[in-house]
């Protein structure tokens, strides 16, 4: 969104990520992202990242994570969206053919304040990061219960702080959350992390809304936000899904006003 909506060049993005790495987003991946934007191709003099073909390969760890999550019923939409994003990127020939055919808004049509959007993206990235880790740690907790692993989630976060590509300053906050409450069901329920998310919600929503309005795909941001909104919903429209399942397949349903399992004739 920084590149497409604001038209930022590689050297500008490098400066932004370098600055972000000095604060709460301090992490290995932010650090190397800044370095990637700085690298100039020796032959052409252009930013090397602009010459890299936009087809992301994968070794399978993301796919395995998604598969395992489905097996134990753990919702990890942000991780799933990352896997799907790579798969969609691999459809390069199809995307090139679709680009002039499928209509969409002008992606360079952002008319708001440039610096405000940059700051909003920074806040949205941090909030999305909390949401993504909440999903991942929740999955580990559910796997620990399912397979009797007896995992210490705070210790796992501490281990990740060194010698791992996801090492980040933020992991200290995860460890602290589990020190405060070892049986924490979800990181979003931690008082400090929950406050951090709520403070960044306006910026987070603004970024997703802006991206959607400009036709810029931001699956990580949007999946993370949808997870947050779903998790905080006392009631979801899944009652309609279950009613449909009972209608076409007699899969039964539970009621809100009494115990038991029921099947109805819907016609």
Task: Say what each PLM segment does.
Residues 1-213, 217-218:
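C-terminal substrate-binding/catalytic lobe of Rossmann-fold NAD(P)-dependent dehydrogenases
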Residues 198-199, 203-267:
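C-terminal amphipathic alpha-helical interaction region
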């Amino acid at each position: 969104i920084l590149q497409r909506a604001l038209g930022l060049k590689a050297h500008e993005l490098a400066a932004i990520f370098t600055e972000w790495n000095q604060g709460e987003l301090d992490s290995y991946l932010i650090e190397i992202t800044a370095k990637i934007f700085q690298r100039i191709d020796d032959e052409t003099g252009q930013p090397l990242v602009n010459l890299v073909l936009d087809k992301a390969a994968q070794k399978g760890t993301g796919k395995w994570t998604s598969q395992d999550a489905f097996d134990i019923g753990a919702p990890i939409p942000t991780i799933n969206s990352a896997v799907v994003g790579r798969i969609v990127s691999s459809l390069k020939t199809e995307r090139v053919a679709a680009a002039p055919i499928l209509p969409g808004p002008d992606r360079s049509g952002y008319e708001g304040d440039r610096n405000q959007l940059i700051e909003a993206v920074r806040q949205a990235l941090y909030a999305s990061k909390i949401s993504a880790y909440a999903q991942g740690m929740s999955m580990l907790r559910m796997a620990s219960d399912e397979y009797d692993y007896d995992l210490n989630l705070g210790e796992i976060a501490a281990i990740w702080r060194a010698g791992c590509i996801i090492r980040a300053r933020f992991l200290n906050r995860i460890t602290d959350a589990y020190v405060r409450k070892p049986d924490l069901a979800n990181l979003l329920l931690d008082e400090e992390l929950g406050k951090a998310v709520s403070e960044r919600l306006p910026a987070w929503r603004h970024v997703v809304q802006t991206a959607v309005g400009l036709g810029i795909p931001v699956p990580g941001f949007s999946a993370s936000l949808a997870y947050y909104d779903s998790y905080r919903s006392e009631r979801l429209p899944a009652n309609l899904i279950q009613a449909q399942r009972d209608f076409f397949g007699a899969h039964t349903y539970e009621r809100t006003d009494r115990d038991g399992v029921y099947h109805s004739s819907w016609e």
